[in-house]
Amino acid sequence: MNNEIVKKWLSSDNVPQTDKDIISKMKNEELELAFSNAPLSFGTAGIRAKMAPGTQFLNKITYYQMATGYGKFLKNKFSNQNISVIVAHDNRNNGIDFSIDVTNILTSLELEFICLKIINLLLRQLFSYAIRKLNAQGAVIVTASHNPKEDNGFKIYNETGAQVLPDDGLKVVELMPNVFEMIDLKVANDDSLITYLNEDIFRQYYEDCKQALIKTNINESKEFSIVFSGQHGTACKRLPEFLKLLGYKNIILVEEQCIFDGNFSNTPTPNPENRAAWDLSIEYADKNNANVIIQVDPDADRFALGVRYKNSWRFLSGNQMGIIYTDYILKNKTFTKKPYIVSSYVSTNLIDRIIKEYHGEVYRVGTGFKWVGDKINKIKDSEEFVVGFEEAVGALNSTINRDKDAYQAAALALEIYNECLKNNINIIDHLEKNIYGKYGIIHNDTISFTFVENNWKELVKKSLDKILKYSEKTIGNRTITSIKYNEVGGCYDWILDGDSWLRFRMSGTEPKFKVYYNLYGENLNALSQEAKTINDQIKTLLNL
């Protein structure tokens, strides 16, 4: 801890009195955690942290610091060029104020701006789309996706619409000024450098999204009921609007969760990957006799599908949706070039079996959609895009942008659901009988272990070291054929017999240790039980 920084913080006019009161009551351990000379650094998906006073948290001063580093980075990269940057925020608390702080810093560096009016909450995928459409050089969005309400973030993009890669992230951090330079900084907004986007960008985006669709007839009215929750986020109004343009007329809003609320007051978790996020949606579905539920997270990049199946509810994972998308697109779309998929190393490998039939290829990348976007940028024109996805309910179904896109994912998922209805088959049976029956029965899952200790990264690294040094030849009933560190994937691999594997990594956005399962077998129930047995063995090994 630097005592001079703390003193400076307490005397600065840029620090509100409420924050000064909080600092004054901090214990030494809390001050050590909150204050240091080191700037914040980028994780899997930008910079995310708690909103609080201190150099290691998010506040006006650290946003000044981050925005200055990014602005200098852009000026270095695009020297002697006009630079346009898009700035926006999602629905999180303080998002408006922080986006204004970012804008004020960047305009002080004389960068031209394109940004949405404050009243319009920006959909993250539209952000990526707008960069490409408007030929901008970069973008900043104030968001922490589905993180807890106490958090916010700083996510930056390059001129292709993809999130910046680690090397560029390091350059931005290196260009961030010392926090002493930011504490008493005074900046003013220069409106002459700001252009505000209007509704045209949404209409253009909706039109271009249709290229992700194959059989959807927008003039055909789809009468089945769809329950929708926006988890208090940016898609609460826009996604139903978009789906109605595609002919889905009977959309039932989960009213309590379709209002903008940075506190996420009416949901136990805003992450549709978690089962608890679905409880209220199920109540709505049961009340309205609906058989399908769709959800997106607050910044509308994650999409998830739930369907009624044999008097219960099934929620499809990112892996399952990736498999369904892959099979459907390859079967129903005409490809004039070699088809390709981009997916992470920790995502299912059943797609490799499917695309092999079509003489295509799967490109594997590290965890984080920035790697998916980057790989798409590098693929030659002699190949044709199928889908990009991760196991964490995130997909991209066309190349109009370079980030996960819940709008495209929802539209294609509902098209497939509608086609299954026409063929009198539940989408779950389609997956487990038609697809698994042809390509192999597989159990994919992700188990997360959450750490509450401040030194959680050190604890996770110790766990990963045990994984690498594991000396047994089996796990569960599986033979371990090799154990290695996957440098590109950023994970530790246990390669098992029968085309199966386990992978382990530290989360880049939350204090979690993650285990990824990819197990083939003869029976789904047996595979599920086997995964539980393996999970118990791993917990014992790591003392979790």
Curated annotation (Swiss-Prot):
The active site is at residue 145. The keyword Magnesium applies. Disulfide bonds: none annotated. GO terms for molecular function: magnesium ion binding; phosphomannomutase activity; phosphopentomutase activity. Its cofactor is Mg(2+). It comes from the Bacteria. Pfam families: PGM_PMM_I, PGM_PMM_II, PGM_PMM_III. Signal peptide: none annotated. Its EC number is 5.4.2.8. It is an enzyme of class 5 (isomerase). The keyword ATP-binding does not apply. InterPro entries: A-D-PHexomutase_a/b/a-I, A-D-PHexomutase_a/b/a-I/II/III, A-D-PHexomutase_a/b/a-II, A-D-PHexomutase_a/b/a-III, A-D-PHexomutase_C_sf, A-D-PHexomutase_CS. One of its GO terms (biological process) is carbohydrate metabolic process. Keywords: Isomerase, Magnesium, Metal-binding, Phosphoprotein. Gene3D superfamilies: Alpha-D-Glucose-1,6-Bisphosphate, subunit A, domain 3, Alpha-D-phosphohexomutase, C-terminal domain. Binds 1 Mg(2+) ion per subunit. This is Phosphomannomutase.
